[in-house]
Regions:
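N-terminal cap/lid segment of alpha/beta-hydrolase-fold proteins
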Residues: 56-100, 343
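Conserved loop-alpha-helix segment in the C-terminal half of the alpha/beta-hydrolase fold
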Residues: 308, 312-329
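Short, surface-exposed "cap/lid" segments of acyl-processing enzymes
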Residues: 96-151, 166, 170
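Alpha/beta-hydrolase-fold enzymes
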Residues: 14-37, 173, 177-178, 182-277
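Short beta-strand/loop motif that positions the catalytic acidic residue
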Residues: 298, 304-306
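Active-site nucleophile elbow and catalytic-triad environment of alpha/beta-hydrolase enzymes
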Residues: 271-294
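Catalytic histidine-centered segment of alpha/beta-hydrolase-like enzymes
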Residues: 337-350
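Alpha/beta-hydrolase active-site loop
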Residues: 154-175
Length: 370
């Protein structure tokens, strides 16, 4: 009896493994066929290519944890530079650049996830991939992140874009001959990138890519407030925020004590983020992050790369009606991919999001040449 059960389990595992090896998905695309974005999307080969998720990452949590923490990073050591802001704050940006790269090379600016930087897998591998393809890559670290000195009370959030704009203009001044510039954001960074698509004026950004935007921030936070998700995601992210506060000399011992009690983002955002922004509470801040009202205001070609199994979001929240009214926004979705991961093939040498992002930028460059 036990032997029969074990045999059935073994056969089931074999069939499941074969199924995973052969599994592929055709990405779904949502965009206005009459809009400016259409000519870019229709030119992209990667948007029509089947996505083969990594067989052994067979659920959204494995994909996400692998993509955020376990994929590792390249051995490349980027150049670091401090950028200073008008209010006395600063951030440390990093350059991923090939030797003898011409000044005319396109620039890819990357905004990391919450509390991350070039040390996180998704940011590091995207930067390395673009660098190998002759882009000058700039990791736009936020205040307090990636080893940046904390020199102001204000830290980072997913709405204000003035720090990012300062970094972009600083790099633009250093490399005025660069013909094309792109902005890529992951998770919280994608919220900043999307907002920059509305706020940008003098930066000449040619295209924006937003990877794993939660779409509905408040609802997304509720999704990860389950016991399992709290252990898998919430605790490490909250610890990252708390570590920044611990290092800061701009918060009193009483404030720090209160912040350390928090177990969810709302607690932190009520005390820190909302107050630094001049808002009353976290709810006001989360409302500013909602994507739906922004879609028709974005004025730069912007591609959202989204996985339907993202543990921080829900495909039902995709603002399809607003996308059809926009000239500049497209959504590319996959059945699998987790949050910021999109691992593909057995070894995942290049993730699906990396492949799509480069293709998107290259198509824009080609179109602009004509």
């Amino acid at each position: 009896m036990i032997g029969t059960i074990l045999f059935i389990i073994f056969i089931s595992c074999v069939f499941f493994f074969i199924y995973r090896l052969t599994l592929k998905y055709t990405p779904k695309l949502f965009f206005n066929k009459e809009g400016e974005i259409a000519k870019i999307i229709l030119k992209m080969k990667s948007a029509k290519k089947p996505y083969h998720p990594t067989p052994w990452l067979f659920n959204k949590h494995l994909q996400t944890i692998y993509g955020l923490r376990l994929r590792g990073r390249s051995s490349y050591k980027p150049q670091r530079e401090d950028v200073f802001f008008k209010d006395g704050g600063q951030a440390t940006i990093e350059y991923f650049v090939k030797e003898n790269l011409p000044d005319e090379a396109p620039i890819a600016y990357i905004v990391h996830t919450l509390g991350g930087g070039s040390r996180e897998s998704c940011t590091n591998f995207m930067a390395t991939y673009f660098m190998k393809n002759n882009y000058r890559v700039v990791i736009c670290s936020c205040r307090g992140c990636n080893g940046s000195k904390i020199t102001s009370r204000r830290l980072f959030n997913g709405y204000q874009t003035d720090d990012l704009n300062t970094i972009i203009l600083h790099v633009k001044e250093k490399y005025p001959k660069a013909k094309n510039k792109f902005l890529i954001g992951f998770s919280l960074g994608s919220m900043v990138a999307a907002q920059y698509g509305i706020d940008c004026n003098e930066s000449d950004i040619d295209g924006i890519i937003c990877i794993s935007h939660t779409i509905e921030c408040f609802k997304g936070l509720k999704l990860i407030e389950t016991p399992l998700n709290m252990k898998l995601y919430y605790r490490p992210m909250m610890n990252s925020l708390k570590n920044i506060i611990k290092k800061s000399t701009y918060y009193s011992d009483e404030e720090k004590k209160e912040i350390m009690k928090g177990k969810i983002f709302k607690h932190y955002d009520d005390i820190v983020t909302s107050k630094n922004m001049g808002l009353n509470n976290a709810e006001e801040y989360y409302k500013l992050l909602e994507l739906r009202p922004k879609i028709t205001k974005i004025k730069v070609p912007t591609l959202f790369i989204f996985s339907e199994d993202d543990p921080f979001s829900n495909p039902e929240w995709i603002p399809k009606d607003e996308i059809q009214k926009s000239k500049f926004v497209a959504f590319l979705t996959t059945k699998e991919g987790g949050h910021t991961s999109f691992a593909q093939g057995w070894k995942n040498k290049v993730s699906f999001s990396e492949e799509v992002s480069l293709d998107y930028c290259e198509c824009i460059i080609e179109i602009k040449k004509k």
